[in-house]
């Protein structure tokens, strides 16, 4: 998750003019009206900081090392390997497989895979990598 707006933080509520009579809120007798307005503004600023902290915490939940992000990267890597295997299949049917395709498949298999928290996903990823390694070994034996 990315924060895309850098606009200022506004106060949470609209300020209303207080009646001239007795106010029911807390006030210090020694504080004049100007410093009272300044303290009200500082409280509103603190509220804004709290919301920024909440946004940063939310952003950290979807960070690079988060389980959801690791899972997405693992699935993306598996999709890439499956796409290359599809190209290999088509090239075998056509009878013309290039060294570039074999090299891409080899590099895709050698990439370090991140562990995920999902055992079923890990099993599928292992099967995809095993299939890719077997196909690569067969093609290299045929070519060499």
Swiss-Prot record:
Membrane topology: Peripheral membrane protein
Subcellular location: Cell membrane
Entry superkingdom: Bacteria
Keyword RNA-binding included in the entry's annotation: no
Region (Disordered): 1-28
Disulfide bond sites: none
Coiled-coil ranges from the UniProt annotation: none
Keyword Disulfide bond: no
UniProt entry keywords in alphabetical sequence: Bacterial flagellum biogenesis, Cell membrane, Membrane
GO annotation, cellular component aspect: plasma membrane
Low complexity composition bias: residue spans: 1-15
UniProt cross-references to InterPro entries, sorted A to Z: Flagellar_assmbl_FliX_class2
GO biological process: bacterial-type flagellum organization
Pfam families named in the record: FliX
Main location: membrane
Physiological role: Required in an early step of flagellar assembly.
Protein name from the UniProt record: Flagellar assembly protein FliX
Organism listed in the record: Caulobacter vibrioides (strain ATCC 19089 / CIP 103742 / CB 15)
């Amino acid at each position: 998750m990315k924060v895309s707006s850098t606009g200022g933080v506004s106060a949470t509520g609209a300020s209303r003019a207080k009646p001239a009579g007795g106010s029911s809120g807390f006030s210090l007798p020694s504080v004049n009206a100007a410093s009272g307005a300044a303290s009200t503004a500082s409280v509103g600023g603190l509220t804004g900081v709290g919301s920024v902290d909440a946004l940063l915490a939310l952003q950290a939940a979807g960070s690079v090392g988060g389980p959801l992000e690791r899972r997405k990267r693992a699935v993306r890597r598996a999709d890439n390997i499956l796409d290359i295997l599809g190209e290999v299949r088509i090239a075998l049917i056509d009878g013309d497989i290039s060294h570039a395709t074999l090299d891409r498949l080899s590099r895709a298999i050698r990439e370090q895979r991140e562990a995920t928290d999902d055992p079923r996903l890990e099993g599928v990823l292992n099967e995809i990598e095993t299939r890719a390694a077997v196909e690569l070994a067969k093609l290299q034996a045929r070519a060499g």
